């Protein structure tokens, strides 16, 4: 797992915790912030996956030429 993907997963986990604490405490602002953090983490994860895919394709094409 790349560092980018690892950090994205941490962002998602942190967001889930914030959202949960917001729900428990009745703090809608914290709950919303947690939801935003989860979505941001998911977007970062998708971008990291896309980068890994492109790197893999480039490596495969490079090996094909040899």
Swiss-Prot record:
Belongs to the UPF0337 (CsbD) family. Pfam families: CsbD. Disulfide bonds: none annotated. Transmembrane segments: none annotated. This is UPF0337 protein SPy_1261/M5005_Spy0972.
